[in-house]
C-alpha cells in the first residue's frame, strides 16, 4: 500500500525528525525536512517541494515539481514589517518578467505574494531549474587540481556580457548589483549556456549621495552588495561619484578575475579596492587577451571604465566570435571601441594606469559634492604667472611654490594638492591672473604626463609598467627654489592673513580642475593607498638633495646680510624672529625695519641645516649654541640657560647683539648658581624631613608593639608592672642575686632599641619574632632604622652596669626581680674547630636574614642569634628541638656556647651532638669554654664494664635530683596558691597568669584564669619559636626537665567555656610578685 494517502501521492513524513542543518529563518518558515512534500499554490501553478538546494540572506531555494514532474526552482521568503524587503521581492518578480525569453537570464515561471497577517508576507518566485552552477564547476576543478580552460572562461564571460547588456539596455536600465560566480547557473544544453540569476538586489535607481544622502546610500550598498565585488565608488561615498551601471562593470571584472585564478583580487579589503591594488598570479598562465579585459574593467575612474557595450565587444573579440545579441548588434553607441591589441599595448606600456583617475569630465547629472572650505580653496590662484611654465609642445606643467606662504591681499596662492600618484593634468578652465593680468590656459596646451605605477599591478611574466617621465632624473622635488623676492615678499612687515594650508617647497604639477575637485573631497574612509604611498615620504627622501642645493637660496634678510658681510656663522631662525624691534638684526648700527611674519618663519624653519657640531668650540663668545635652533627661542630665561650646557660654537666677532647675548648668558649663570644653592638647601630639608619621617616611623613601630603587647596582658615595653601576673620563681637567694646584678634601669627608647635593634655583626637587624604581634610590614619598618649604623655595633648583651644604661630602668621586664640579669660577654674565641657544622648557627641565621637585609660590608660571625623576647635582652641560640627521649638521659653534651656544666658532665666521654631533652644543665654567666675531657686512666676493667659501672651512678644522681625538684614544686605550688588567695583578698583586679604570658579571652570580654594551679616551667625564659632555647642565663640551682603543659586546663573560671588564646606561642615566663605592687 503506498504511503501517499493524503494529498499528492508523494511519500509523506509521519514523524517530526529534525535533520541537522535545518534552520528557521523567519516566523512560520518551515525547516528543510518539514517542507519536503509540501504542496504550494502560486498564481498559476501548483508545485510540491522536494528538497532544499540553497539558502541566501533573505530567502531559501527549493527544488519543486509540478504534476507533470517538471523541475522548478522555488524561491520562498517571509518578511515581517519590512517594506523594503517586500518591495525588493516585487521588483525581482517584475524584472524577471521583463527578461523572459533571454537565454542567459533565468526564465520566470510564476510568482506569488500573500499576506499572512500580523505584518507577515509570504513571497514565492518560481523559475526554471538548472542543476549545476559555476561555483560547483570551480569546486570540481579544484578537487581535480585543475583550472578552468580559456575557452570556458571566455564562454562564461561572454554569456554574462550578453545578460548584463540586455538588462542595461532596457528602456529603464536595470542594475543587478550582485554579479558573482554564485549567481551564474549552467544549463543542460550542449554546449551549455551560462545563465544569470538572483535579481533580488537589482534596482533601477542610480544612487547619489547628493540626492539621497550618505546614510541611505550606505545602507543600500551594504544590504544589496557583496564586499569583495564592490566598486571603489561604493567604498568612498564622499567621492561624489554615482553608483550606477558602471558598478556592474567593475563586478564583471572581479568575476572574470575569479574565474581565471579562483580567487578575488582584493579579498575583503576596502583599502585595496579603493587603491585598485591587485596583481596577476603566475599560475595559471592566462593570456593577455583575458588579462586586458580585467585591466580595462577594474578601472578606478568611472568615466574611463568601459560600458557594457565596449566590454562585450572586447570579450567577443577575445573569444574570436561576433556578438549574437541583438542588443549589442543594434546598439547605437557613440563611444569609440578600442581594439583589443591597442588595449594590450596600453596595459604593457602603463602609460595610462587604471588605478588613477583621468581628467575626463564628471557626470553632468550628478556633480561631485564639495565642502565649502574646499570650494573656497578653488578660488585661490598662483602669485605670478611667470612661475608657471606652460609649454605649448610636449613639456610638462611645472610650478614652484615657496613653503608655507600666506596668501596676501594682492597675491593669491592656489591650494595645490600634495604630491600623490594622481596623474598630473592641465587645468583647461582655471584662470590664473597675476597682478591685474589674466590669462587663460587651454587644455590643448598641456599634455598629460604619466607617473610611475608603483602599486602591485605586476603582470606575471610580462613587461613591467615603464615610467614615461624617466628623463626627469632629478626627481619631483629637486627643482631650484624660487627666491622670496620673486614671489613678491614686499609687504612682510604688514600683518599676514591667515593661511589656508601649509605647503612644502618642491616641484608641483597642476592637475586638471576635475582632479582638484576629486582630491579635495572629504575622504572619510582614509583607505586610499595611492594617497599615502608617495606623498608621505617624498619630501623626506629629497630633503638631503634640497639641503645640498640650498646654498643658492636666500632665506631671510638676516641671511642676506650675513652673506654680504662674509660671515661664516650658521643662520638661526629664532635670532631673527620678531621678539622685539631692537633685537631682530642690526646692520651698520642701524636697526632694520624687517619684521618676520609667521609664513616667513615657517619657510625658513624648514630649511634649518642639520650638521654636526664642530669639535673646536669657544665657550667665551656666547652661551647660546648657534647650531641649536631653539637656543634663542623666546622662552623663559631659565629655560634658555639650559641650552648653555651644550658646547657653544665659535661665532664671528661680537656685535652689539652678541654683547646682549653675553649679558644674558652671565645673568643666566648667576641665576643658575642661585638655583643650585636653593637646590642644596632643598636637599638638606628633604634629608631632615626623611630623618623626621624615620623617627616617626620608629615611634609608630613602638606604639604598635606597645598596643600589641598591652593586649596580651602587658607584655609590651610600656606595660605596667600591675598588668603582669605573679611569677613562679620567688626564691630569696635568686632575688638577692638578681638585685646584686642589676645596677639600674634603661629608658624605654634605649631598651626597645637594645632589645630589638641591637646590631652586633650578624644581629641587630633582625625583626621581632614571628608571633610577637607585629605584621610583616611592621618588620620592614624596623629595617630602615636598624640598618643605619654600619661600622660600630653595640654589644649584643646589655649589662645594667655599663655606660649603655645610664637612665633609670623603665622597662617593666627589667624591673622584675626574678628576671635574669645580663652582663657584657667577652668576644668568643674564633677557633671553632671542635664544633660540628650542623651547629654553625651564625650561618643558619645569615641565610635567613639575607632574604630581607643586605649583609653589612664589615661584620664578624656571631654564634648567638640576635633575636630576643619582648621581656628579654638576652640573645637566644637557634636550635631545633629534638624529639622527646623514650628512656632516661644518660649524659649531657657540651654546647657551642660558654655555658658552665657540672663536673660530672664534663667528664663525659661521649661524642658532641645535640642535647637531649631531660639533660640537666646549669645556665649561667658566660665563662671560658669547657676544657676538653681529661684522658681517663687505664684500668683492668674492660670497656664494657666501665660503661655499665658509669650508667647506674649517673642514673642514680638524676633520679635523686628529679625527686628533689618534684618536692620543691609541690612546696612552690602551695606557696603560690596562698599568695594568690591573699592577692585576691586585697581586691586586686589583676588576675594571676599561668606563666605563659598568654591572655585568656572569654565570650563576655573579661579576662579570667582558672583557679587550678598549673605546673610551672623550670626554665625562667623560653623562646616563642620551637627552635630557640635559652642559652646564657645562669640560675642558682640546676633545673629539672621541662614539663609540657596541656591546654585542656586553660578554661574560663567564670563561664566554664573553652578560652581562645591571643598569643599561644609564648612559653611560660616569670611574673612579678604581686607583693611588689
From Swiss-Prot:
One annotated GO biological process: positive regulation of Notch signaling pathway
Record field: compositional bias (Low complexity): 541-554
Residues that hold ATP according to the record: 53-61, 75
EC number: 2.7.11.1
Pfam family, one: Pkinase
Extent of Acidic residues compositional bias: 655-679, 770-780
Described purpose of this protein according to its UniProt entry: Serine/threonine-protein kinase which may play a role in lin-12-mediated cell-fate decisions.
Protein name: Serine/threonine-protein kinase sel-5
Organism: Caenorhabditis elegans
Amino acid at each position: 500500500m503506498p504511503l501517499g494517502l493524503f494529498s499528492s501521492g508523494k511519500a509523506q513524513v509521519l514523524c517530526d525528525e529534525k535533520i541537522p542543518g535545518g534552520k528557521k529563518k523567519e516566523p512560520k518558515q518551515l525547516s528543510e525536512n518539514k517542507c519536503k512534500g509540501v504542496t504550494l499554490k502560486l498564481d498559476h501553478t501548483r508545485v510540491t517541494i522536494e528538497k532544499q538546494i540553497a539558502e541566501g540572506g533573505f530567502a531559501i531555494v527549493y527544488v519543486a515539481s509540478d504534476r507533470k514532474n517538471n523541475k522548478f526552482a522555488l524561491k520562498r521568503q517571509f518578511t515581517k514589517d519590512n517594506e523594503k524587503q517586500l518591495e525588493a521581492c516585487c521588483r525581482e518578480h517584475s524584472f524577471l518578467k521583463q527578461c523572459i525569453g533571454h537565454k542567459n537570464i533565468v526564465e520566470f515561471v510564476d510568482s506569488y505574494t500573500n499576506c499572512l497577517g500580523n505584518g507577515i508576507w509570504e513571497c514565492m518566485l518560481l523559475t526554471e531549474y538548472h542543476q549545476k552552477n559555476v561555483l560547483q564547476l570551480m569546486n570540481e576543478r579544484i578537487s581535480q587540481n585543475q583550472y578552468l580552460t580559456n575557452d570556458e572562461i571566455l564562454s562564461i564571460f561572454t554569456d554574462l556580457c550578453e545578460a548584463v547588456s540586455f538588462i542595461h539596455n532596457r528602456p529603464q536600465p536595470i542594475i543587478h548589483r550582485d554579479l558573482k560566480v554564485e549567481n551564474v547557473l549552467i544549463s543542460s544544453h550542449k554546449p551549455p549556456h551560462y545563465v544569470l540569476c538572483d535579481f533580488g538586489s537589482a534596482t533601477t535607481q542610480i544612487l547619489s549621495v547628493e540626492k539621497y544622502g550618505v546614510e541611505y546610500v550606505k545602507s543600500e550598498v551594504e544590504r544589496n552588495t557583496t564586499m569583495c565585488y564592490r566598486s571603489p565608488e561604493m567604498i568612498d561615498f564622499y567621492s561624489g561619484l554615482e553608483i550606477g551601471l558602471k558598478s556592474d562593470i567593475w563586478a564583471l571584472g572581479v568575476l572574470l578575475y575569479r574565474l581565471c585564478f579562483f580567487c578575488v583580487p582584493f579579498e575583503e579589503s576596502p583599502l585595496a579596492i579603493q587603491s585598485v591594488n591587485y596583481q596577476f598570479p603566475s599560475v595559471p598562465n592566462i593570456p593577455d587577451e583575458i588579462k586586458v579585459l580585467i585591466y580595462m574593467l577594474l578601472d578606478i575612474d568611472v568615466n574611463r571604465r568601459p560600458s557594457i557595450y565596449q566590454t562585450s565587444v572586447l570579450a567577443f573579440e577575445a573569444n574570436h566570435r561576433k556578438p549574437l545579441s541583438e542588443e549589442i548588434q543594434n546598439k547605437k553607441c557613440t563611444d569609440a571601441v578600442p581594439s583589443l591589441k591597442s588595449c594590450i599595448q596600453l596595459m604593457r606600456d602603463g602609460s595610462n594606469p587604471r588605478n588613477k583617475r583621468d581628467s575626463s569630465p564628471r557626470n553632468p547629472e550628478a556633480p561631485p559634492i564639495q565642502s565649502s572650505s574646499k570650494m573656497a580653496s578653488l578660488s585661490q590662484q598662483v602669485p605670478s604667472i611667470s612661475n608657471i611654465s606652460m609649454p605649448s609642445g610636449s613639456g610638462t606643467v611645472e610650478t614652484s611654490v615657496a613653503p608655507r606662504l600666506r596668501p596676501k591681499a594682492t597675491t593669491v596662492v592656489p591650494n595645490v594638492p600634495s604630491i600623490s600618484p594622481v596623474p598630473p593634468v592641465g587645468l583647461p578652465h582655471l584662470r590664473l591672473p597675476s597682478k591685474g593680468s589674466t590669462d587663460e590656459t587651454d587644455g590643448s596646451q598641456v599634455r598629460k604626463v604619466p607617473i610611475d605605477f608603483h602599486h602591485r599591478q605586476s603582470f606575471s611574466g610580462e613587461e613591467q609598467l615603464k615610467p614615461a617621465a624617466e628623463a626627469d632624473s632629478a626627481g619631483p622635488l629637486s627643482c631650484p627654489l624660487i627666491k622670496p623676492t620673486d614671489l613678491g615678499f614686499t609687504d612682510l612687515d604688514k600683518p599676514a592673513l591667515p593661511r589656508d594650508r601649509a605647503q612644502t617647497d618642491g616641484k608641483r604639477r597642476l592637475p586638471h580642475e576635475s582632479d582638484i575637485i576629486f582630491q579635495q573631497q572629504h575622504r572619510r574612509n582614509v583607505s586610499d593607498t595611492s594617497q599615502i604611498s608617495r606623498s608621505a615620504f617624498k619630501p623626506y627622501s629629497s630633503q638631503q638633495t634640497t639641503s645640498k642645493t640650498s646654498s643658492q637660496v636666500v632665506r631671510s634678510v638676516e641671511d642676506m646680510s650675513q652673506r654680504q658681510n662674509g660671515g661664516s656663522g650658521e643662520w638661526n631662525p629664532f635670532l631673527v624672529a620678531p621678539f622685539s624691534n631692537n633685537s631682530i638684526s642690526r646692520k651698520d648700527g642701524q636697526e632694520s625695519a624687517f619684521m618676520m611674519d609667521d609664513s616667513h618663519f615657517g619657510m625658513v624653519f624648514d630649511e634649518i641645516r642639520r650638521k654636526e657640531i664642530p669639535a673646536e668650540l669657544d665657550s667665551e663668545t656666547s652661551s647660546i649654541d648657534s647650531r641649536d635652533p631653539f637656543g634663542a627661542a623666546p622662552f623663559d630665561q631659565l629655560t634658555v640657560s639650559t641650552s648653555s650646557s651644550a658646547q657653544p660654537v665659535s661665532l664671528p666677532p661680537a656685535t652689539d647683539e652678541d654683547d646682549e647675548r653675553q649679558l644674558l648668558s652671565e645673568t643666566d649663570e648667576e641665576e643658575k648658581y642661585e638655583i643650585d644653592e636653593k637646590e642644596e638647601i632643598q636637599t638638606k630639608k628633604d634629608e631632615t624631613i626623611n630623618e623626621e619621617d624615620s623617627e616617626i616611623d620608629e615611634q609608630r613601630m613602638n606604639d604598635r608593639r606597645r598596643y600589641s603587647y598591652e593586649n596580651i596582658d602587658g607584655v609590651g615595653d610600656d606595660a605596667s608592672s600591675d598588668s603582669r601576673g605573679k611569677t613562679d620563681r620567688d626564691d630569696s637567694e635568686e632575688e638577692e642575686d638578681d638585685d646584686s646584678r642589676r645596677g639600674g634601669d634603661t629608658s624605654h627608647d634605649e631598651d626597645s632599641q637594645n632589645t630589638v635593634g641591637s646590631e652586633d655583626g650578624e644581629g641587630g637587624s633582625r625583626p621581632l619574632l614571628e608571633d610577637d604581634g607585629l605584621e610583616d610590614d611592621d618588620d620592614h619598618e624596623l629595617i630602615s632604622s636598624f640598618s643605619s649604623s654600619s661600622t660600630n655595633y653595640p654589644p649584643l648583651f646589655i649589662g645594667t652596669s655599663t655606660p649603655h644604661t645610664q637612665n633609670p630602668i623603665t622597662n617593666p621586664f627589667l624591673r622584675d626581680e626574678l628576671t635574669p640579669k645580663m652582663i657584657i660577654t667577652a668576644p668568643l674565641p674564633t677557633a671553632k674547630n671542635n664544633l660540628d657544622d650542623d651547629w654553625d648557627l651564625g650561618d643558619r641565621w645569615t641565610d635567613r636574614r639575607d632574604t630581607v637585609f643586605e649583609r653589612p660590608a664589615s661584620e664578624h660571625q656571631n654564634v648567638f642569634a640576635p633575636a630576643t623576647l619582648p621581656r628579654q635582652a638576652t640573645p637566644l641560640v637557634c636550635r631545633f628541638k629534638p624529639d622527646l627521649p623514650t628512656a632516661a638521659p644518660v649524659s649531657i653534651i657540651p654546647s657551642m656556647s660558654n655555658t658552665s656544666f657540672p663536673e660530672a658532665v664534663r667528664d663525659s666521654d661521649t661524642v658532641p651532638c645535640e642535647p637531649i631533652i631531660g639533660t640537666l644543665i646549669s645556665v649561667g654567666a658566660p665563662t671560658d669554654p669547657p676544657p676538653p675531657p681529661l684522658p681517663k686512666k687505664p684500668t683492668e676493667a674492660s670497656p664494657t664494664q666501665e660503661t655499665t659501672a658509669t650508667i647506674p651512678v649517673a642514673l642514680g644522681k638524676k633520679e635523686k635530683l628529679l625527686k628533689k625538684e618534684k618536692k620543691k614544686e609541690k612546696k612552690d605550688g602551695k606557696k603560690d596558691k596562698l599568695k594568690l588567695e591573699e592577692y585576691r583578698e586585697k581586691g586586686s583586679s589583676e588576675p594571676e597568669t599561668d606563666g605563659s604570658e598568654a591572655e585568656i579571652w572569654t565570650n563576655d570580654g573579661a579576662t579570667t584564669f582558672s583557679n587550678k594551679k598549673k605546673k610551672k616551667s623550670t626554665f625562667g625564659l623560653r623562646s616563642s619559636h620551637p627552635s630557640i632555647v635559652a642559652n646564657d642565663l645562669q640560675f642558682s640551682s640546676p633545673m629539672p626537665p621541662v614539663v609540657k603543659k596541656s591546654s585542656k586546663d586553660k578554661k574560663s573560671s567564670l563561664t566554664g567555656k573553652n578560652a581562645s588564646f591571643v598569643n599561644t606561642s609564648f612559653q611560660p615566663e616569670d611574673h612579678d610578685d604581686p607583693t611588689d605592687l
